[in-house]
């Protein structure tokens, strides 16, 4: 009997020491610890959530429909190039998720089957129609979200944000948490920019240039496009270049007619960095393509000498220089009315790679560091006040047994904080609410046991026998209530978002630790007091 009690005391002491070791990195004392301690023992501790230390919580939605269309467009481009190399010059057009090839040719069908086994081929109205099966599109959707996560992660890494959290949510949503970010607006612009870099030829042969206005006001692009849609050849489209009046600051858009066919994309970029034009002292973005991109760029510039090549990023034309000669080495540049910061941001998104499809911001919650600090203080105060009032009530109502319950309460808080630190859990404001709830539940368990003990004492049992019977009878009631709470917490964790998950984690840990402190902690104290002694009364 005595040996069993001492073993339980040793177990409690061990768990307390372990909890303190794990929580130590979150205290000022950690800075005084020797080097060997920091190297060999836990050094991370509890991570504060965005609502406590400030930062941005962003949710992006990947445009999966556009991802499907982009995939088909790329296949169409590749087929066009492939067929031309084979000496065939069919018309290849992409409409939505279908590729139309004219004329119908058995050699063309054979080349398609050899290179794209997934494509289903049919004939209709003098066209070869190519389509991807739904299974292939599902792979495209999954891959697009995964690639978008990687691209966003690369961009955030270049921003230098410490401990960002990025993960998939649902089918096509990406959750991005940026703790302590100083410029949320800039971060949002860099993360959300699609960075689809495209090189297209200007259509210099069309007579529509004479009717085209030199400038339109910014914001009138949609109206302008609707007016011109019916006038354009099927193979052309209009893109705009941003023009800023340096004197007034007014923004205008200059329309250009370009070919829809994409000659080269930013997928083949190897490097992008900011350079300064020595003649005009203006920044520009210098590009270098990889070997495959350099070869394509060389072919383009060799084939279209004296033609204007439009450099388009996310649908906006940046420049349209005249190709003077074949360019070898795969070097190009994007110039425009950049500030140095704008050029740097553009280089970042190009270096990190293009998003596989456009992303749309559907939620943006930004918490300032001051508000986060206030939340921590308010949360601390709530837990402290709750603990004090609960402790006083227990002492007044249950006397010495109330003191034992308060010991269990302190033990519960120490072990809970230690467990959170051991898991490197992210503590949010709802998480603090979970701690406060765990405090209430810890006391609730003791109340159940103490009332059972009182009932046994009224039946005439000795204090020692009343304690034993009271604990046995209360055990299953306490156990059942805690298991049902754990089930609820598990559901919250599975279906909830970040803050709700934080609440679920602290609640789950609190429930598990509460079982330990209530059924082992307080029982050990009672056994220690009454070991080898038969007291006639019990302060309860």
Curated annotation (Swiss-Prot):
Molecular function terms from GO: protein-transporting ATPase activity
GO-annotated cellular components: plasma membrane
Ranges that cross the membrane: 4-24, 376-396, 403-423, 430-450, 475-495, 502-522
Chief localization: membrane
Keyword Transmembrane found: yes
Topology relative to the membrane: Multi-pass membrane protein
Pfam families: Sec_GG (PF07549), SecD_1st (PF21760), SecD_SecF_C (PF02355), SecDF_P1_head (PF22599)
InterPro entries the record matches: Acrflvin-R, SecD, SecD/SecF_arch_bac, SecD/SecF_CS, SecD_1st, SecD_SecF_C, SecD_SecF_C_bact, SecDF_P1_head
Leader sequence residues: none
Domain of life: Bacteria
Gene Ontology BP annotations: intracellular protein transmembrane transport; protein targeting; protein transport; protein transport by the Sec complex
Alphabetically ordered keywords of this record: Cell inner membrane, Cell membrane, Membrane, Protein transport, Translocation, Transmembrane, Transmembrane helix, Transport
Subcellular location as annotated: Cell inner membrane
Sequence similarity: Belongs to the SecD/SecF family. SecD subfamily.
Reported function: Part of the Sec protein translocase complex. Interacts with the SecYEG preprotein conducting channel. SecDF uses the proton motive force (PMF) to complete protein translocation after the ATP-dependent function of SecA.
Quaternary context: Forms a complex with SecF. Part of the essential Sec protein translocation apparatus which comprises SecA, SecYEG and auxiliary proteins SecDF. Other proteins may also be involved.
Protein name: Protein translocase subunit SecD
Native source species: Thermodesulfovibrio yellowstonii (strain ATCC 51303 / DSM 11347 / YP87)
């Amino acid at each position: 009997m005595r040996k069993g009690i001492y073993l339980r005391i040793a177990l409690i002491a061990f768990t307390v020491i372990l909890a303190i070791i794990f929580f130590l990195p979150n205290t000022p004392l950690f800075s005084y610890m020797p080097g060997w301690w920091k190297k060999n023992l836990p050094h991370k501790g509890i991570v504060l959530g965005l609502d406590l230390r400030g930062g941005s919580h962003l949710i992006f939605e990947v445009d999966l429909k556009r991802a499907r269309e982009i995939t088909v467009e790329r296949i169409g481009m590749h087929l066009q190039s492939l067929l031309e190399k084979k000496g065939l010059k069919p018309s290849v057009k992409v409409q939505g998720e279908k590729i139309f090839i004219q004329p119908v040719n058995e050699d063309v069908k054979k080349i398609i089957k050899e290179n794209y086994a997934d494509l289903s081929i049919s004939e209709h109205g003098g066209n070869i129609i190519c389509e991807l099966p739904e299974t292939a599109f599902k792979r495209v959707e999954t891959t697009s979200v995964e690639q978008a996560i990687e691209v966003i992660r690369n961009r955030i890494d270049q921003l230098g944000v410490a401990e960002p959290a990025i993960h998939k949510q649902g089918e096509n949503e990406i959750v991005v948490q940026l703790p302590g970010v100083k410029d949320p607006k800039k971060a949002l612009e860099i993360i959300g920019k699609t960075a689809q870099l495209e090189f297209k030829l200007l259509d210099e042969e069309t007579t529509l240039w004479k009717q085209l206005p030199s400038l339109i006001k910014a914001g009138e692009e949609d109206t302008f496009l609707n007016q011109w849609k019916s006038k354009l050849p099927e193979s052309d489209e209009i893109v705009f270049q941003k023009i800023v009046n340096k004197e007034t600051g007014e923004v205008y858009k200059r329309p250009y007619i370009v070919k829809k066919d994409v000659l080269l994309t930013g997928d083949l970029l190897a490097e992008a960095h900011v350079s300064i034009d020595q003649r005009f002292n203006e920044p520009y973005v210098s590009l270098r393509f990889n070997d495959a991109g350099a070869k394509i760029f060389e072919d383009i510039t060799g084939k279209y000498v004296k033609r204007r090549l439009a450099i388009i990023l996310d649908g906006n034309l940046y420049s349209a220089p005249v190709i003077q000669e074949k360019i070898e080495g795969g070097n190009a540049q994007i110039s425009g009315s950049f500030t140095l910061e704008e050029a740097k941001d553009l280089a970042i998104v190009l270096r990190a790679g293009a998003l596989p499809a456009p992303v749309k911001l559907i939620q943006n919650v930004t918490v300032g560091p001051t508000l986060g600090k206030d939340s921590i203080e308010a949360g601390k105060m709530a837990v402290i006040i709750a603990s004090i009032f609960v402790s006083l009530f227990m002492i007044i109502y249950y006397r010495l047994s109330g003191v034992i319950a308060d010991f269990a309460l302190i033990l519960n808080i120490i072990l809970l904080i230690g467990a959170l630190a051991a898991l490197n859990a992210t503590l949010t404001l709802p998480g603090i609410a979970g701690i406060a709830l765990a405090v209430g539940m810890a006391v609730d368990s003791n109340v159940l046991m103490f009332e059972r003990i009182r009932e046994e004492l009224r039946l005439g049992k000795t204090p020692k026998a009343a304690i034993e019977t009271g604990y046995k009878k209360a055990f299953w009631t306490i156990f059942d209530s805690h298991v049902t709470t754990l089930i609820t917490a598990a559901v919250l964790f599975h279906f909830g978002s970040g803050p709700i998950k934080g609440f679920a984690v602290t609640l789950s840990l609190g429930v598990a630790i509460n079982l330990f402190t209530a059924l082992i902690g307080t029982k050990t104290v009672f056994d220690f007091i009454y070991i080898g002694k038969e007291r006639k009364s019990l302060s309860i």
